[in-house]
């Protein structure tokens, strides 16, 4: 078990544990696991009588035929007992007050995870403040061959993240922690791992896949002013990934991020990640589009709303990814547009709402700053910084004449966050690279499953009570890619 303390006032803290350096030029950034087969659990926890699990395997022949190179990931927000309400009339009564309840529920969670036997398990809302529960997870997971990494949220929030790596599948090269030290005391784990079994890149060469596992849990959007905080959290993760790749001279690698993103496919975080070349693995497996937000759910929140918020994001190798800062600015402008839409302000009226007298008028930098306050992006403790505001102004003043006019507003209003295609293509293993092409190993999504099964149909079963989140498992297979 790792115990950590927050000893810095920096907005983002990076801590690392270095394990032997890696040498292969072909690396992967992924949140993965080797699952023997997708599994549905039926009749699970329908009442208080703690009936044993009834298990139904899907495609049982898959287990024996699956090649060793297949990998998969399980991500699951297990609902910390300190947050689980047990009395709807008295919200101050939590499961953490009743040992028999939280002990039994978490044992059923462990039964599910150990039966799946994913090579990487990423958990959120682990009750790290309770030694008995922590020991329970560490003992059972380590006894089953997992190495465990744990990270508490800052400011003694009581819960945190846990990532378990199966020793039969991955060797840990490097482990780092990100402490955002922001409004929500959120954190992230990054693990650089390498496959134990080499992957045949071609007929002459075997390589060990190198992988980065990212596990995180973003802030819940209690109100629209927190949109910028959530965007900051994702930006910090992507910014650090870029720095890590540069520091270790890593090129052409897939990246997978997983966790509870506390936002749906309609949100700014989703669009931001899509603009950086990421795909939702679950949607890719089921051939859903970005507009298919209603097809599946993974969470019923404390307000009783059901939505899809748990993702395993995949970004395959590419040299043509849009600059991160460009995507960031586009995402902030998207928030401004959303806030105006939410206030029922159309494009024709937006300019006057922001402070202009009419369409022939223009806004100075001071006017622009006041406009940002109106849409909850500045003037609040967790809003845009001075430097970010200046950068936004430079991007808004397209012609560089020192003022912001209506024509520039229209261009921003009509701007869309385009999903960024890559310049690497999947190739058959026997194919030879052309001049100017580089070889890389990418990932192909084979299968993605939500448990409980009803969540895949956009429904939430009333008898499901091991968490307020669904468990998501995605299976990948490595593919050769040629990057031009």
UniProtKB/Swiss-Prot annotation:
InterPro entries: CCR4/nocturin_mRNA_transcr (IPR050410), EF-hand-dom_pair (IPR011992), EF_hand_dom (IPR002048), Endo/exonu/phosph_ase_sf (IPR036691), Endo/exonuclease/phosphatase (IPR005135). Its main location: membrane. The keyword Transmembrane applies. GO terms for molecular function: calcium ion binding; catalytic activity. Residues 384-419 form the EF-hand domain. GO terms for cellular component: membrane; nucleus. PANTHER family: CARBON CATABOLITE REPRESSOR PROTEIN 4 (PTHR12121), ENDONUCLEASE_EXONUCLEASE_PHOSPHATASE FAMILY PROTEIN (PTHR12121:SF50). This is Uncharacterized calcium-binding protein At1g02270. It comes from Arabidopsis thaliana (Mouse-ear cress).
